[in-house]
Each structure stands twice: as structure tokens, then as C-alpha cells.
């Protein structure tokens, strides 16, 4: 009994691990070139007393756009994806036929050789008929998909690269009625693409990684159960 329970637990673990391995995910670690590129050095500036353009916490006249590590920037995510794909295959093959060997005839006067020829001809007198074979295969499939993602979140400048570009990362979690929504965004942006109100469109993100996930009972009901998914994945037919 214990052995059966143990084997059942092992089988359950294997099925669960196979199903988990098929779940897509995104690695939000910075690209290699971001790690390899030196950070831009910032030289602190001393405040000038009596100046309207000081570098204090809240200067009277200053650019409100993010410029340094840990500054915040608002990302307007507007992504649309659509795909339309179809395929068809029609395969037919047929085979069949017969084979007749040559006949042996002796035209001489020697009776012994004549009988030998008749004997050999009788042994060789056959027809080979190949059975007919017909194969038909027809298959096809189509897929049409359209997705729109419109959302706004704030991100933080993680690193200012030596050329002045920013590597940013943002994370947003919302919990409503037991349904948790998680949005993660990372990428490299140019300061010139930041608008005056300190916002940037997601289309300007290089090496962009955008992940939108729903967690909860409602989301689970729209997903295939892991046991069924694992069995279909391993099914050879």
C-alpha cells in the first residue's frame, strides 16, 4: 500500500513538473550590454544662492523629466498583436502492377534438351501480381488571434548608461475581488523620447519586456488543467 502511494506521488510530481515546464515566462534581468556598459558619472552641482535655476529638491524652473537613477517615469503601454494563419495538406498515393517472366522454348531436334527446356519453362511459368495500395491524407488548420493591452504604470530608472540611455523597470500589482493582476515592464529608452509630462510610449522601449498576468479562481477556470495538458503533451497520437 505504501509503495503504491509512493509511486502515485512520484507520478503526480512528474506530471506536475512537465506541466509547469510548459508555462511561458519572461526573464526580466537586464540585457548583457546593459550590464557591460559603464554607468554615466554624475558630478554633483552646488546650489547657487539667489538663483531661480538651482538644483535643489524643488527648483522653481527645472525640467520635470526623469534624469537620474531612481527617478520615476510613467510608461503608457499600448500594445496590439494580431495573427492570422492557416494551412492545409492533401496527400494521395497509389501503387499496383504485375510481372510476367520470359518463356523458355527449345527449337532444336534433340529430344533430351527439348524436355529439359520444357521442364525449366514449367518451373518458370508464373505471374507476380502486386497488391493495389491507395493512401489518402487530408488535414488543415487555421488560427486567428487579436490582443490589445492598454495600461499605464510608473517605472524606475535602474541604470543610466554611458551614452545617456536609461534602463528602466516597473512593476504593478492590483488585487480586486480575489483576482490579482500583475504587470511588469522593462527596457531601454532614450531621454529624447520622454515627453514633457514625464511619460513615454511603450513603442519607444528597446529590448522591451512586457508581462501581464492574472491570478485567481476566475483566471484558473480559463486555463487547461495541468494533468490534461501533460497527458496531451506526452500522447504519441
UniProtKB/Swiss-Prot annotation:
It comes from Helicobacter pylori (strain J99 / ATCC 700824) (Campylobacter pylori J99). Assembles around the rod to form the L-ring and probably protects the motor/basal body from shearing forces during rotation. The basal body constitutes a major portion of the flagellar organelle and consists of four rings (L,P,S, and M) mounted on a central rod. The keyword Protease does not apply. One of its GO terms (biological process) is bacterial-type flagellum-dependent cell motility. It is found in: Cell outer membrane; Bacterial flagellum basal body. HAMAP family: FlgH. Keywords: Bacterial flagellum, Cell outer membrane, Membrane, Signal. The gene is flgH. It holds the Pfam family FlgH. Residues 87-111 are annotated as: Disordered. The keyword Membrane applies. One of its GO terms (molecular function) is cytoskeletal motor activity. Residues 1-21 form the signal peptide. This is Flagellar L-ring protein.
Amino acid at each position: 500500500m505504501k509503495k503504491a502511494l509512493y509511486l502515485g506521488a512520484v507520478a503526480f510530481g512528474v506530471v506536475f513538473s512537465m506541466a509547469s515546464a510548459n508555462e511561458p515566462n519572461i526573464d526580466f534581468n537586464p540585457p548583457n550590454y546593459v550590464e557591460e556598459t559603464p554607468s554615466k558619472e554624475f558630478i554633483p552641482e552646488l546650489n547657487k544662492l539667489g538663483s531661480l535655476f538651482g538644483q535643489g529638491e524643488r527648483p522653481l524652473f527645472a525640467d520635470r523629466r526623469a534624469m537620474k537613477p531612481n527617478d520615476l517615469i510613467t510608461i503608457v503601454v499600448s500594445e496590439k498583436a494580431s495573427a492570422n494563419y492557416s494551412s492545409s495538406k492533401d496527400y494521395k498515393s497509389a501503387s499496383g502492377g504485375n510481372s510476367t517472366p520470359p518463356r523458355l522454348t527449345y527449337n532444336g531436334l534433340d529430344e533430351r534438351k527439348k524436355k529439359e527446356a520444357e521442364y525449366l519453362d514449367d518451373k518458370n511459368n508464373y505471374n507476380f501480381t502486386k497488391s493495389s495500395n491507395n493512401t489518402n491524407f487530408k488535414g488543415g488548420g487555421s488560427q486567428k488571434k487579436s490582443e490589445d493591452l492598454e495600461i499605464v504604470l510608473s517605472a524606475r530608472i535602474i541604470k543610466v548608461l554611458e551614452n545617456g540611455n536609461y534602463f528602466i523597470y516597473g512593476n504593478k500589482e492590483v488585487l480586486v475581488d480575489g483576482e490579482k493582476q500583475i504587470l511588469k515592464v522593462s527596457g531601454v529608452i532614450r531621454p529624447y523620447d520622454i515627453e514633457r509630462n514625464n511619460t513615454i510610449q511603450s513603442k519607444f522601449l528597446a529590448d522591451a519586456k512586457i508581462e501581464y498576468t492574472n491570478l485567481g479562481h476566475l483566471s484558473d477556470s480559463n486555463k487547461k488543467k495541468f494533468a490534461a495538458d501533460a497527458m496531451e503533451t506526452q500522447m504519441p497520437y
